[in-house]
A protein has these predicted regions:
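Positively charged n-region of N-terminal signal peptides that target proteins for export
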Residues: 1-4
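Sec/Tat signal peptide C-region and signal peptidase I cleavage site
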Residues: 15-21
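Bacterial N-terminal signal peptides
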Residues: 6-15
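Flexible, processing/modification-adjacent segments and terminal tails
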Residues: 22-30, 39, 103-176, 196-199, ...
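Gly/Pro-enriched, hydrophobic low-complexity segments
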Residues: 96, 157-253
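A short, sequence-level motif marking secondary-structure junctions
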Residues: 83, 104-108, 125-131, 181-182, ...
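N-terminal mature ectodomain segment of secretory-pathway/periplasmic proteins
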Residues: 22-116, 149-155
Length: 271
């Protein structure tokens, strides 16, 4: 009788194990796991951004299968970041001329486009993976909300090629993010851009070529697609952690730019 009981318990455990393995994390559990994996506190990153024409056509009037790069639209960025407090993005053209300046320091925010011939919006320049990497749940939630993901439901997601991901968001609405279920690295963000005729374009942001620096993983390459056609690629060219940021100099620069042109500066600002 005892042997039969042991056999039954073992059988039940074997059948139960796969179900438990595929039971998704709660939001709180996911936030805890991600917090444990954040090693950086302050960092400076430099990126190179390539821009492509997603709707370029060939001589036959069909969409080009090879992305058509627009070198004149490329730019580079210098990003200063302190987890949970500071995000400053200097966006420059290839000659080093400032195109856009983004300054976020606790409750202060300045976002200003500086070239009338090349207007850049805030959503064009934000480094989404940095905010999502934060130790702080509010910052991670904000990173999702900035890309249209409000609903925080978590489920497993099986892709067409049978890869398994963690999914945050609402799949049916088209607003969701996919994570690696083992490392919790951000794999992709999905959104829909609605047009005036009530149709939409599928926006997909892919985070790839993960590397490790100072015990922290990060995506070296981020690619942006509209209806599966590449329109932007961001590559991290340089990265280092810092003991302090040059915040005084950057703050002075922000105030000078604010007085030069009309900009947005608010207290208690939330994107």
């Amino acid at each position: 009788m005892r042997l039969i009981l042991i056999f039954l318990i073992g059988t039940l455990f074997c059948f139960a194990a796969p179900a438990a393995a595929f039971f998704p994390l709660s939001w709180d559990d996911l936030m805890f796991q991600m917090e444990k994996r954040m090693s950086w506190n302050r960092a400076k990153l430099e990126t190179v951004v390539q821009v492509f024409d997603p709707f370029a056509k060939n001589a036959d009037g069909e969409f080009s299968k090879i992305p058509v790069e627009l070198p004149a639209r490329s730019f580079k960025q210098v990003i200063h970041w302190k987890d949970g407090e500071i995000l400053i993005v200097e966006t420059q053209d290839e000659q080093g001329q400032l195109l856009h300046f983004y300054y976020e320091n606790k409750d202060e925010l300045l976002s200003i486009s500086l070239n009338d011939n090349r207007t850049l919006e805030t959503e064009d320049i934000l480094p989404h993976q940095l905010r999502f990497r934060s130790r702080y749940e509010d910052d991670r939630s904000r990173a999702l909300e900035e890309t249209g993901i409000i609903y925080k439901a978590i489920a497993y997601h099986i892709s067409d090629d049978n890869h398994v991901f963690l999914r945050i968001g609402d799949f049916e609405s088209g607003h969701f993010a996919l994570l690696n279920p083992k490392t919790y690295d951000l794999i992709s963000i999905h959104n829909r851009l609605w047009l005036e005729d009530e149709t939409w374009l599928e926006l997909k942001i892919v985070f790839k070529n993960y590397e490790t620096y100072r015990w922290q993983t990060y995506a070296k390459v981020t690619e942006y697609f509209l209806d599966n056609r590449l329109f932007k690629r961001t590559t991290v060219s340089k990265i280092r952690t810092l003991s302090r940021l040059p915040i005084k100099e950057l703050q002075e620069q922000a105030w000078k730019l604010r007085h030069l042109q009309t900009a947005t500066l608010q207290n208690n600002y939330a994107l």
